[in-house]
Amino acid sequence: MLNQIVLVGKVVELPEIRETASGNKVANLLLEVDRNYRNVHGEFDKDLIMCTLWRGVAESASTVCKIGSLVGVKGRLQANSFDTKDNRPFYYCEVVAEKVSFLESQSS
């Protein structure tokens, strides 16, 4: 079976590192990614996709990323769930990044 996702987009929010109770570093990276087709107005709609970064990937992204930076993210889609206050299950997916590539030079 294969669970792989590749995204190329622009950084919308800077990743901020935090630590889990077990001491692992984690950050979230919000990307704006163009859809691969044009809408009725001839423009590309955009999706905002939250990526979770762990350990060294989180550390390097937090020091290099700037708002508007073009980055590539390779990772996997992870399904999660929790029970709401009224005991109903809530399901969501997140992108867990295994690698972040910085696609612009630092001077850009």
Show the residue positions of the predicted features.
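Single-stranded nucleic acid-binding surfaces, predominantly the OB-fold ssDNA-binding core
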Residues: 1-108
